[in-house]
């Protein structure tokens, strides 16, 4: 029996890549495609809709969301309230929103996944960085993305910082009398260390965590050169959420 999937934001680069991934997996099938910019009514026999409300009564198992931070919270609530297990790759959730959605999913008995990053290598980077932070508490995070990305820092950088903060000896880095000659030059402050965001054309998704200590340094880096790198994680997420009864934040919980 195939898992029936709705993809929201299918006109975007991630959404369109997800469509091809689902079409190429015999265990999955497309139930519907949703995008406010859609002009067609169907794609290869799959019905297309402009609004989420039009698919509320549809028979489907999973709602895959690659829309925008502006809409993704309400979209995820909608999915849970209508019996679809959400797999969400759009970032920008607040901790309070994640807590609310987790509680709602438990109430509905539905699995779900909010993943700042679907690339397996990025998940490993986060785990390796958290391990290193126990021994190298002085660090900075640099994330680099394409120039159309709307949120900064990236969800991956925030998740990495959160994992590091759980194990790192808390301290403030830099000179005590440090002064920014240009506002923001030192990046965003997070628990005593800094996060830097780079936005340039030609990039896809990249991140490095740089650690420093007396006489040595350590750099952990991950690069996604193509959006196909995320599809293994999306595929895993779709197949795992239908087995679960509560939403999780981070792909690492499904590995």
UniProtKB/Swiss-Prot annotation:
The keyword NAD applies. GO terms for biological process: diaminopimelate biosynthetic process; lysine biosynthetic process via diaminopimelate. CDD domains: DHDPR_N. PROSITE patterns: DAPB. Keywords: Amino-acid biosynthesis, Cytoplasm, Diaminopimelate biosynthesis, Lysine biosynthesis, NAD, NADP, Oxidoreductase. It holds the Pfam family DapB_C. The active site is at 145 (proton donor/acceptor), 149 (proton donor). (S)-2,3,4,5-tetrahydrodipicolinate binds at residues 146, 155-156. It is found in: Cytoplasm. It catalyses: (S)-2,3,4,5-tetrahydrodipicolinate + NAD(+) + H2O = (2S,4S)-4-hydroxy-2,3,4,5-tetrahydrodipicolinate + NADH + H(+); (S)-2,3,4,5-tetrahydrodipicolinate + NADP(+) + H2O = (2S,4S)-4-hydroxy-2,3,4,5-tetrahydrodipicolinate + NADPH + H(+). NAD(+) binds at residues 9-14, 89-91, 115-118. InterPro entries: DapB_C (IPR022663), DapB_N (IPR000846), DapB_N_CS (IPR022664), DHDPR_bac (IPR023940), NAD(P)-bd_dom_sf (IPR036291). GO terms for molecular function: 4-hydroxy-tetrahydrodipicolinate reductase; NAD binding; NADP binding; oxidoreductase activity, acting on CH or CH2 groups, NAD or NADP as acceptor. Pathway: Amino-acid biosynthesis; L-lysine biosynthesis via DAP pathway; (S)-tetrahydrodipicolinate from L-aspartate: step 4/4. SUPFAM superfamilies: Glyceraldehyde-3-phosphate dehydrogenase-like, C-terminal domain, NAD(P)-binding Rossmann-fold domains. It is an enzyme of class 1 (oxidoreductase). Its EC number is 1.17.1.8. One of its GO terms (cellular component) is cytosol. Catalyzes the conversion of 4-hydroxy-tetrahydrodipicolinate (HTPA) to tetrahydrodipicolinate. Belongs to the DapB family. NCBIfam families: dapB. This is 4-hydroxy-tetrahydrodipicolinate reductase. The lineage of its organism: Bacteria, Bacillati, Bacillota, Bacilli, Lactobacillales.
């Amino acid at each position: 029996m195939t898992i029936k999937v709705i993809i929201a934001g299918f006109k975007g680069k991630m959404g369109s890549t997800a469509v091809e991934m689902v079409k190429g997996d015999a265990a999955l099938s497309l139930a519907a495609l949703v995008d406010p910019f859609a002009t067609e009514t169907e794609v290869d026999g799959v019905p297309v809709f402009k609004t989420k409300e039009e698919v509320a009564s549809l028979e489907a198992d999973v709602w895959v969301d690659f829309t925008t931070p502006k809409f993704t919270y309400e979209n995820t609530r909608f999915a849970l309230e209508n019996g679809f297990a959400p797999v969400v790759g759009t970032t920008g959730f607040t901790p309070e929103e994640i807590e609310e959605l987790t509680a709602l999913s438990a109430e509905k008995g539905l699995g779900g996944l909010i993943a700042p990053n679907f690339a397996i290598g990025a998940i490993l980077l986060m785990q390796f960085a958290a391990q290193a932070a126990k021994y190298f508490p002085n660090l900075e995070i640099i994330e680099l993305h394409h120039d159309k990305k709307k949120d900064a820092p990236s969800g991956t950088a925030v998740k990495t910082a959160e994992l590091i903060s759980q194990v790192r000896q808390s301290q403030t880095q830099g000179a005590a009398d440090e002064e920014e000659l240009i506002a923001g030059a030192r990046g965003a402050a997070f628990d005593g260390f800094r996060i830097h965001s780079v936005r340039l054309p030609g990039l896809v998704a990249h991140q490095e965590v740089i650690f420093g200590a007396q006489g040595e340094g350590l750099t952990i880096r991950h690069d996604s050169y193509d959006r196909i790198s995320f599809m293994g994680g999306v595929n895993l997420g779709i197949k795992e959420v239908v087995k679960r009864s509560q939403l999780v934040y981070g792909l690492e919980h499904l590995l």
